[in-house]
Amino acid sequence: MELLYQLAWLIPVLPLFGATVVGIGLISFNQATNKLRQINAVFIISCLGAALVMSGALLWDQIQGHASYAQMIEWASAGSFHLEMGYVIDHLSALMLVIVTSVALLVMIYTDGYMAHDPGYVRFYAYLSLFASSMLGLVISPNLVQVYIFWELVGMCSYLLIGFWYDRKAAADACQKAFVTNRVGDFGLLLGILGLYWATGSFDFGTIGERLEGLVSSGVLSGAIAAILAILVFLGPVAKSAQFPLHVWLPDAMEGPTPISALIHAATMVAAGVFLVARMYPVFEPIPVVMNTIAFTGCFTAFLGATIALTQNDIKKGLAYSTISQLGYMVMAMGIGAYSAGLFHLMTHAYFKAMLFLCSGSVIHGMEGVVGHDPILAQDMRIMGGLRKYMPITATCFLIGTLAICGIPPFAGFWSKDEILGLAFQANPLLWFVGWATAGMTAFYMFRMYFMTFEGGFRGNDQEAKDGVLQFYGLLPNFGPGAMNVKELDHEAGHDDHGHSSEPHESPLTMTFPLMALAVPSVLIGLLGRPWANQFEAFIHAPGEVVEHAAEFEWGEFYVMAGNSIGIALIGITVASLMYWQHKFDPKVLAEKFPSLYQLSLNKWYFDDLYDKLFVQGSRRVARQIMEVDYKVIDGAVNLTGLVTLVSGEGLKYLENGRAQFYALIVFGAVLGFVIVFSLT
């Protein structure tokens, strides 16, 4: 087994090798590489499959009690400065390796069906493999410098994949927005890393925590400075995990192809922020103000994401705001000291949210056969309905994911979310109440999505409904790449003339198999965290923490907390059923009764508008003023210098006439002038 640990560096290198080989092929032999599309896909999937096998073996060995393993080499040295690079395999990294490789493998299989007709099929696989390599490198990083390197690489891959369809303006704008927003958090992270090194002289997670605590307790370092440095580091996870106020990029990231929405923006990259908080736990935990900041940031983000998701009509954006909300739960858990609970929810959420996103892609794939390849129409739930009849596998898997995220037992989300709420009640009842209310909203908007998409009658052939959607957005149809028939771009003509069917269809096996595979952990994996026999907590717990099991499990307390969680979820489900399935209440009446709240949710709390006015328009105004200064002052000074040189040159050229007696006269005049001046003084 020691050989496996010594070769663990291959886990991130294998997908990197796949991406490199295919990438070189695309650059050097583009046409030939694209013709061998499925061979390239199988090659990349095989590389990742090998990484999954190695990751699974490492996780199993860690479960059996193998000690943590670290392999380091000295990368840079100058005097007392030593920087080491390498990898570490411990309980947390082994778990994350399996999560990343398993979800990535299923997403790559799914991609073969979803991107089958896209001309960028091979390029997409190369990007996916590069991302998988970067994410795997991140989770085995032993220090902050290496984390930061891979942190930026996953950000770059996110940029490439969000803007994959770069000829669509919305996608090009979205990848820039994601990149710029994440740079704000990453700048804070970089400052925090440098500040912590200045204070402690180390980049190692555990060493930083020990030394920082010692410096603060001895009075050498101010507690306020330590808190500021820790909060600067936390800015990185705030951006990467889409926490308030840097959450605005994630919904726009849905402009990328759906497989990357599942892999990057639901299961792995956005969870990297929570992972970094876990790694930095020895630094954060001793500083109460930092822990409170983390807890309340997560709590407010969970509430914010849920309130916006209530009114979303785009199926992917609804899931995006749901992701923001669930990430808020994880961050809140880390802030209240519920280390194990936060990471448990990270694991369960990775599987059921990846499945939900892939289900949404399956729905979009089916809808495109009816409404065409305009993402506005193909993704809007108002023209779906009744899809359970046509897409039973997708509908069943989406229902499983919905029950899991709503916290209905025995599905995975119940055990992880209920544990967070129970510990939040012990830490701060206010945090519990907000989380509890958010759980009710989660149940409402998720079943709203399910009922609007899969129940009732199919509305995809209703031209009036489609026109209403286009009118709502105030946009003309915007057909994206991937249309299989040029005639499909003619939106106004009838469907029969364009090869469109009048009914959606179930997706191929390459797309439905990953859904069914992800449904298994979405149902069963939560049982690892049963509170009376919490195997997950026994395996994953905070550094230095000793897990103590109570002699007797408090069933009464469990029934009260679980009953509250299930009760609020059932209320949310019931309200959604009455509105969107049984149609006992008209949601429009409620929107008209509370127009301010409805508009607040529909307009995403106006954060995009506020940021546009403050930062986008504000920076443009500043840029225009700087341009005026540059034009009038800087350019004026430069031009004036040139003018003075020109005029003086024009004047002086007449002195250079080539006559010696004229030069002698000038010399005589100059000498005479000096004599007169000195005689007077």
UniProtKB/Swiss-Prot annotation:
It comes from Synechocystis sp. (strain ATCC 27184 / PCC 6803 / Kazusa). NDH-1 shuttles electrons from NAD(P)H, via FMN and iron-sulfur (Fe-S) centers, to quinones in the respiratory chain. The immediate electron acceptor for the enzyme in this species is believed to be plastoquinone. Couples the redox reaction to proton translocation (for every two electrons transferred, four hydrogen ions are translocated across the cytoplasmic membrane), and thus conserves the redox energy in a proton gradient. One of its GO terms (cellular component) is plasma membrane. It comes from the Bacteria. GO terms for molecular function: NADH dehydrogenase (ubiquinone) activity; quinone binding. One of its GO terms (biological process) is ATP synthesis coupled electron transport. Its main location: membrane. This is NAD(P)H-quinone oxidoreductase chain 5. Keywords: Cell membrane, Membrane, NAD, NADP, Plastoquinone, Quinone, Translocase, Transmembrane, Transmembrane helix. InterPro entries: NADH_UbQ_OxRdtase_chlpt_su5_C (IPR002128), NADHpl_OxRdtase_5_subgr (IPR018393), ND/Mrp_TM (IPR001750), NU5C-like (IPR003945), Proton_antipo_N (IPR001516). Belongs to the complex I subunit 5 family. Its EC number is 7.1.1.-. It is a multi-pass membrane protein. The chain crosses the membrane at residues 7-27, 39-59, 89-109, 120-140, 144-164, 188-208, 219-239, 258-278, 289-309, 327-347, 352-372, 395-415, 420-440, 509-529, 558-578, 660-680. It is found in: Cell membrane. PANTHER family: NADH-UBIQUINONE OXIDOREDUCTASE CHAIN 5. It catalyses: a plastoquinone + NADH + (n+1) H(+)(in) = a plastoquinol + NAD(+) + n H(+)(out); a plastoquinone + NADPH + (n+1) H(+)(in) = a plastoquinol + NADP(+) + n H(+)(out).
